[in-house]
Amino acid sequence: MMQFVIAAPRSGSGKTTVTCALLAALKKRGMAPCAFKSGPDYIDPMFHRSVLGVESHNLDLYLSAKNTVRELYAHYAAGHGAVVCEGAMGFYDGQGLTTRASAWELADALDLPVLLVAQPKGASVTLAAEIQGLVHFKPESHIAGILLNDCSEKLFRMLKPLLETETSLPVL
């Protein structure tokens, strides 16, 4: 089963748009996707369900123990061909000034790879440095790939080799 977390360095990077686009593409390919949202957010799961017709649930590490979140994930993901978990806020941003209940903690608790949504507006090499910082901030970041959002095809062709060389991550 294909399963991963969609995360970003900060809010406003396009996580929900990317998540909805991926869910629609997976559904169109007949993969029967299931969606999750980290935290108590009810708006994004409503988009997943109402607009896309994709089953969606919340996974909240602030209100639930890790084992409970793992059990909920296993229960609701069962029988689906793909699972997309949408993170909230910035990748490491959790309760207060901690990583508790962050998208990173969810990826870590579920041992899922992370697709990092990055916006290259106004940056190139600096974007590589920022991503390197996210990858190395914790011993196990789970970041497995980069998706450039709000990026022209021309800029993508220029940034892809740079980012892949500097970060050792595939750029989608």
Regions found by a protein language model. Give the residues of each.
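ATP-dependent carboxylate-amine ligase catalytic core
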Residues: 2-110, 118-142, 150-157
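Beta-strand-loop-alpha "switch" segments that mediate conformational coupling across diverse proteins
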Residues: 168-172
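Conserved anion/nucleotide-ligand pocket segment
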Residues: 158-167
